Amino acid sequence: MKTLIKRLQDQQDIWKRIEIVGDIVIIGVPFNKKPEDLVEIANEILSTFPYVKSVWGRHRDVNGTYRLSTYVHLAGEKRSETVYKEHKCKYFLDFTKVFFSEKLSYEHLRVATQVKRDEIIINMFSGFGPFSILSAVLGRPKIVYSIDLNPYAYYYMMVNVELNKAYEVLPIYGDAFKRIYELEDADRIIAPLPELADKAYEVALQKVKKGGIIHLYTEVETNKGEDPVRIAMNKYRGSYFGRIVRSVNPHKYHVVVDIKAN
């Protein structure tokens, strides 16, 4: 893949958007291009790298209740289901049916390495399971309650629990804002849905133990010269750490803040 990237140095808006998901390559479609403009590159990827079986284009939009991007098949097998390897884990998923972002890989590891043995954890928006399963594998908590409203995410999460033998993870299908009240209070709550950060924060404060930790992912819009991390940390009481997860556009960011409940 590095060879192809070097060949695309003059098209930085394309090569910076390439993600490898198992045996599938996803190319983010730049604002100034159409999916069909990427077909030649997609075919070159297939001919250069035999392990790549399919190439897809992804529009930048994230829509609907399940936060799904719009994908366009470009070349190779018309298949979007694959096994994705990240850190010590394997995940079976269909990226057209569940939220997927390789950019969250660092966050999955950062959170998981903070988990302590026998913790009670609630993941409010679990998706196909990367936060929950890696936390179980590395931290050996007592239990990770993993909630998601997307039936496909719930299905893949159950498969991935078995695939990784992460039996501390308990998949729960439904609305986190309702199902969370059926659960015991947690030592740690993960809330990785930036669009619903304010509501998630208020609910998490009710269900986290005193001295417990909330990992809250939020959207921040800035004016020129403003620090999105500082804005987020000032907004959410108890914040002691923050970092930019990704830039959505020049004035909007996804930021994570770690919060200690008092």
From Swiss-Prot:
<dbReference type="InterPro" id="IPR030382">
    <property type="entry name" value="MeTrfase_TRM5/TYW2"/>
</dbReference>
<dbReference type="GO" id="GO:0002939">
    <property type="term" value="P:tRNA N1-guanine methylation"/>
</dbReference>
<comment type="function">
    <text>Catalyzes the C7-methylation of 4-demethylwyosine (imG-14) at position 37 in tRNA(Phe).</text>
</comment>
<feature type="binding site">
    <location>
        <position position="125"/>
    </location>
    <ligand>
        <name>S-adenosyl-L-methionine</name>
    </ligand>
</feature>
<protein>
    <recommendedName>
        <fullName>tRNA 4-demethylwyosine(37)-methyltransferase Taw21</fullName>
        <ecNumber>2.1.1.-</ecNumber>
    </recommendedName>
</protein>
<keyword id="KW-0808">Transferase</keyword>
<keyword id="KW-0489">Methyltransferase</keyword>
<dbReference type="Pfam" id="PF25133">
    <property type="entry name" value="TYW2_N_2"/>
</dbReference>
<feature type="binding site">
    <location>
        <position position="108"/>
    </location>
    <ligand>
        <name>S-adenosyl-L-methionine</name>
    </ligand>
</feature>
<keyword id="KW-0963">Cytoplasm</keyword>
<feature type="binding site">
    <location>
        <begin position="148"/>
        <end position="149"/>
    </location>
    <ligand>
        <name>S-adenosyl-L-methionine</name>
    </ligand>
</feature>
<dbReference type="InterPro" id="IPR056743">
    <property type="entry name" value="TRM5-TYW2-like_MTfase"/>
</dbReference>
<dbReference type="Pfam" id="PF02475">
    <property type="entry name" value="TRM5-TYW2_MTfase"/>
</dbReference>
<comment type="similarity">
    <text>Belongs to the class I-like SAM-binding methyltransferase superfamily. TRM5/TYW2 family.</text>
</comment>
<keyword id="KW-0819">tRNA processing</keyword>
<dbReference type="GO" id="GO:0005737">
    <property type="term" value="C:cytoplasm"/>
</dbReference>
<dbReference type="GO" id="GO:0008175">
    <property type="term" value="F:tRNA methyltransferase activity"/>
</dbReference>
<dbReference type="InterPro" id="IPR056744">
    <property type="entry name" value="TRM5/TYW2-like_N"/>
</dbReference>
<keyword id="KW-0949">S-adenosyl-L-methionine</keyword>
<dbReference type="InterPro" id="IPR029063">
    <property type="entry name" value="SAM-dependent_MTases_sf"/>
</dbReference>
<feature type="binding site">
    <location>
        <begin position="175"/>
        <end position="176"/>
    </location>
    <ligand>
        <name>S-adenosyl-L-methionine</name>
    </ligand>
</feature>
